[in-house]
Amino acid sequence: MKQALRVAFGFLILWASVLHAEVRIVIDSGVDSGRPIGVVPFQWVGPGAAPEDIGGIVAADLRNSGKFNPLDRARLPQQPGSAQEVQPAAWSALGIDAVVVGQVTPNPDGSYNVAYQLVDTGGAPGTVLAQNSYKVNKQWLRYAGHTASDEVFEKLTGIKGAFRTRIAYVVQTNGGQFPYELRVSDYDGYNQFVVHRSPQPLMSPAWSPDGSKLAYVTFESGRSALVIQTLANGAVRQVASFPRHNGAPAFSPDGSKLAFALSKTGSLNLYVMDLASGQIRQVTDGRSNNTEPTWFPDSQNLAFTSDQAGRPQVYKVNINGGAPQRITWEGSQNQDADVSSDGKFMVMVSSNGGQQHIAKQDLATGGVQVLSSTFLDETPSLAPNGTMVIYSSSQGMGSVLNLVSTDGRFKARLPATDGQVKFPAWSPYL
């Protein structure tokens, strides 16, 4: 069925400065453990060369998920342009039970039709398992590829795809008038642009649940301040600029509240603002430091970091009252948690034996699995479907972004070429 591809990224507009030194995914390990799949180069039905390698985008997305291992193009037994041309036996002989084929066709008005078919080459040979077609302008061809990837991924795994999502992060460059930049890119590092430039540090970007805004910390006024920036027009709303520390913003899943940490009374404590009224209420109290809030799906409970037991550990508290409950017990310290959208697990920075890695904790059983193997890992952020984590780690004298699957098998890097990259935040579905 043909459908016009909806333009979900309304903030890709003229004020956004597109960058050339983009991050790119470099896979370190885990692809071989994925399910084999065939992704054929999409047939270009037009003159000259195709404007975009859609098949390559789909193959890269499926590979980057850690759940699939696309067959190398040099090993493809055939290159069919449609489902009818697929020879199932040729693929099943290589252990492949599903193949993606597609076509890209130019239209007289300058747009393109992008179509794909997912073909069964195993249990029901030749059956079309999923198919779709999108009409898009040239600048949306990559998005069309990610859309096809999302649909193929969901059909084969039962999990909603997250290939149309984005990541926000802070880049610190050397020198210049504005050495700190808040940037946004596609999840795979493409289409990067600057949201805000500053002569002073920027920290802790957090997405609104509809993907239209970013909250972050800025020091441009001479002290820390929390602001919310609307991506479509660049409008900035100041949320908090109290004496001492203002930090760690986190939007509630229902979009009505913003949690953050303030030290205006001396100790660092959690506060929640009602975004409609601007009213702020204090959630935690005491002499301990309480920070790094992350919401549970009900928008009523927070996980957060506290040193009330001596070393940092993760606790849970209801924003309407009640004593915080400690929820991490393994490792010498645990902090900076991010709760999954279904509330079943969280990822966090876990330290033990002098090592600081990203770990996953089952919130029902308390079981902990260390996911990463990089150095001085920080600030984990979950993909909205809970399958991947992006985080920063130290490499040489700098900081880079890394990806790891939540089963720990797939690992990749997103090395930048023009600065240190910190504070990654994965967007919601867009």
Swiss-Prot record:
GO terms for cellular component: periplasmic space. It is found in: Periplasm. Gene3D superfamilies: TolB, C-terminal domain, TolB, N-terminal domain. Disulfide bonds: none annotated. Keywords: Cell cycle, Cell division, Periplasm, Signal. Transmembrane segments: none annotated. It holds the Pfam family TolB_N. Residues 1-21 form the signal peptide. GO terms for biological process: cell division; protein import. Its main location: periplasm. Belongs to the TolB family. The Tol-Pal system is composed of five core proteins: the inner membrane proteins TolA, TolQ and TolR, the periplasmic protein TolB and the outer membrane protein Pal. They form a network linking the inner and outer membranes and the peptidoglycan layer. Part of the Tol-Pal system, which plays a role in outer membrane invagination during cell division and is important for maintaining outer membrane integrity. TolB occupies a key intermediary position in the Tol-Pal system because it communicates directly with both membrane-embedded components, Pal in the outer membrane and TolA in the inner membrane. This is Tol-Pal system protein TolB. It comes from Escherichia coli O8 (strain IAI1).
